[in-house]
Amino acid sequence: MNLQEKIEDLRKRTLSDLLSVADEKTLNNLRTVMLGKKGELTEILKGMKDLTNEERPVIGALANAFRDEFGAKFEAKKLEIEQAVMNAALESETLDVTLPGKAQKKGSRHILTQTQEEIEEIFLGMGYEIVDGYEVETDHYNFERMNLPKDHPARDMQDTFYITNEVLLRTHTSPMQARTMDAHDFSKGGLRMIAPGRVYRRDTDDATHSHQFHQIEGLVVDKNITMADLKGTLDLVMKKMFGQERELRWRPSYFPFTEPSVEVDISCFKCGGKGCNVCKHTGWIEILGAGMVHPNVLEMSGLDSSVYSGFAFGLGQERIAMLRYGINDIRGFYQGDVRFLEQFD
């Protein structure tokens, strides 16, 4: 039997076998056995080395025609098998389209967003404006304009993510004090603003620390602003946030950009000041830092510190939310666990 006859015989057997194939695995096996690298056609074509130059094109064309014919019938058979499998599945499986589908999880505003909006609403009612700032900040505004010149020892209080020697991720929202004072026209009146936003520190993440968290900076600058104005403002805000029965305690502290500086404590809202695990049995909870704007900060913004004065404060959104809702791990705010978040819907 010559090569032409062998190819024709292989063609007939292959197409005959193709008609009886009933599943995709058998179909693929047939293609491999007949046309694969070690298949029958390959073995037949090894004999082409013995053909004359005139015979080789004829046998080659015959082999290619066989491959093309088989390829077309193979694809048609494959579609036929797939359709048969689908039809069988439709007959054997039932679907009740009247059954309710899986309910989608209901979204809601994040608890930190809710906290921020509540604080903003309080200050808007007091005539404050809300300003946004840069999360990528310059060393000049983040430190130097906050009375922290190069090599100032107080810079060690904050571990910083530096991008370049002069560009960094802001460590507090305080740079907005300087930026807002620079842009404000004090000839038209004083300045009252809050600046909410994310800040970054090189902290190790644990239950009470995060490398990223939220602050709300507050600033008031005008003529004749005193510590009494600061105390009255924070007393009003804290009572709106934690209840009218709350008391505030003021302790001397140190911040480079305020003088004098204070730490503000609030009477424990859980035990009423009697002592419990929330207040560590002291009756008081540390809530924020504040103070009168340092004269150097005012002067660097072009203001005469003998004429203008002001106060500033910083609120931590996570801390307020943790205290109000009894949350003991700050990481819950950022892990995206719906079971945690839906508690505050």
UniProtKB/Swiss-Prot annotation:
The subcellular location is: Cytoplasm
Superkingdom of origin organism: Bacteria
MF GO annotations: ATP binding; catalytic activity, acting on a protein; magnesium ion binding; phenylalanine-tRNA ligase activity; transferase activity; tRNA binding
Q: Does the keyword Transcription apply?
A: no
Cofactor binding note from Swiss-Prot or TrEMBL: Binds 2 magnesium ions per tetramer.
Q: What keywords are annotated for this sequence in UniProt?
A: Aminoacyl-tRNA synthetase, ATP-binding, Cytoplasm, Ligase, Magnesium, Metal-binding, Nucleotide-binding, Protein biosynthesis
Which GO terms of the cellular component aspect does the record hold?
A: cytoplasm
Q: Which cofactor does it need?
A: Mg(2+)
Q: What catalytic reaction does the record list?
A: tRNA(Phe) + L-phenylalanine + ATP = L-phenylalanyl-tRNA(Phe) + AMP + diphosphate + H(+)
One matching Pfam family is Phe_tRNA-synt_N
Indicate the principal place this protein occupies in or around the cell.
Answer: cytoplasm
Quote the SUPFAM superfamilies the UniProt record gives: Class II aaRS and biotin synthetases, tRNA-binding arm
Intrachain disulfide bonds = none
The positions annotated for binding Mg(2+) are E259
Q: Which residues form a coiled coil?
A: none
UniProt-listed GO biological process terms: phenylalanyl-tRNA aminoacylation
Q: What EC number(s) would the UniProt record show?
A: 6.1.1.20
Q: What class of enzyme is it?
A: ligase
Assembly behavior: Tetramer of two alpha and two beta subunits.
Q: Which family does it belong to?
A: Belongs to the class-II aminoacyl-tRNA synthetase family. Phe-tRNA synthetase alpha subunit type 1 subfamily.
Q: State the protein's name.
A: Phenylalanine--tRNA ligase alpha subunit
> Which species?
Lactococcus lactis subsp. cremoris (strain MG1363)
Q: Give the gene that encodes this protein.
A: pheS
